[in-house]
């Protein structure tokens, strides 16, 4: 039986936020104040739809956006980690659950030749329309009150594991590798044998630390990391067990 590795994308696989990184394509590399002020909490995807429309209206085209996106640096040790997973695909299934979008993630994985490492990518669907503007839609609708309207990562994870079980695939454990506030929901639903791996110094680690201080219930182990190389060491330990 395999281990399921679940990755966030922004500030986990790549060392930045793809949605804010793309702003460098805007005139003077910044957004107008009224556009920035139009963001409402929980409605990030709708906000990014307006950002992409603004970029398109300003004449920013697909090739320029792609060049910017594939220039994003990987998080330290992440290239080594993804190569390690590729060499051990008989032991791991690997998915991405991300609040970025399908175009950005595809560009990065294609440019770095890491598409084959991931069995599935769950994110907000995006495409260029007939005017050459990038458009983005919600990944799904859900009833979770803890998550943004467009994506509950826990719902996605539970559905994926359930579908795999129906196909006869049962995972020995889940290892969840992430950094952000929207990774808290799936991590708190992990079971006793699972491992939450928050990036050191980021929102997920701070929230889990606070939960621990408040004695809030959490079943999984927590192992923090700052480099993908540390994750390799831990995965090597797991597959030797």
Curated annotation (Swiss-Prot):
GO terms for molecular function: metal ion binding; phosphatase activity; pyridoxal phosphatase activity. CDD domains: HAD_Pase (cd16418). Keywords: Hydrolase, Magnesium, Metal-binding, Pyridoxal phosphate. This is Pyridoxal phosphate phosphatase PHOSPHO2. SUPFAM superfamilies: HAD-like. Its cofactor is Mg(2+). InterPro entries: HAD-like_sf, HAD_hydro_PyrdxlP_Pase-like, HAD_sf, Pase_PHOSPHO-typ. It comes from the Eukaryota. It comes from Bos taurus (Bovine). It catalyses: pyridoxal 5'-phosphate + H2O = pyridoxal + phosphate. Its EC number is 3.1.3.74. Phosphatase that has high activity toward pyridoxal 5'-phosphate (PLP). Also active at much lower level toward pyrophosphate, phosphoethanolamine (PEA), phosphocholine (PCho), phospho-l-tyrosine, fructose-6-phosphate, p-nitrophenyl phosphate, and h-glycerophosphate. Mg(2+) binds at residues 8, 10, 179. The keyword Magnesium applies. The active site is at residues 8, 10. Substrate binds at residues 19, 99. Belongs to the HAD-like hydrolase superfamily. PHOSPHO family. It is an enzyme of class 3 (hydrolase).
């Amino acid at each position: 039986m395999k281990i399921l590795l679940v990755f966030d994308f922004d500030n986990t696989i790549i060392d930045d936020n793809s949605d804010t990184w793309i702003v460098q394509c805007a005139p003077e590399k910044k957004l107008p104040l009224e556009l920035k002020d139009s963001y409402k909490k929980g409605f990030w995807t709708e906000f990014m739809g307006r950002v992409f429309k603004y970029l398109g209206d300003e004449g920013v085209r697909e090739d320029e956006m792609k060049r910017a996106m594939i220039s994003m640096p990987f998080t330290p040790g992440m290239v080594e980690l993804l190569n390690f997973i590729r060499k051990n695909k008989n032991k791991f299934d690997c998915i991405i659950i991300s609040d970025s979008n399908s175009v950005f993630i595809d560009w990065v994985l294609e440019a770095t030749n890491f598409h084959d490492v991931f069995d599935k990518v769950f994110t907000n669907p995006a495409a260029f329309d007939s005017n050459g503007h990038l458009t983005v839609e919600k990944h799904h609708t859900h009833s979770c009150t803890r998550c943004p309207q467009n994506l509950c990562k826990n719902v996605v994870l539970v559905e994926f594991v359930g579908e795999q079980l129906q196909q006869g695939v049962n995972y020995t454990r889940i290892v969840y590798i992430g950094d952000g506030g929207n990774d808290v929901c799936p991590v708190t639903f992990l079971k006793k044998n699972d491992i939450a791996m928050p990036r050191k110094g980021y929102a997920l680690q701070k929230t889990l630390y606070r939960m621990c201080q408040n004695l809030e219930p959490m079943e999984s182990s927590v192992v923090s990391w700052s480099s993908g190389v540390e994750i390799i060491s831990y995965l090597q330990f797991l597959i030797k067990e």
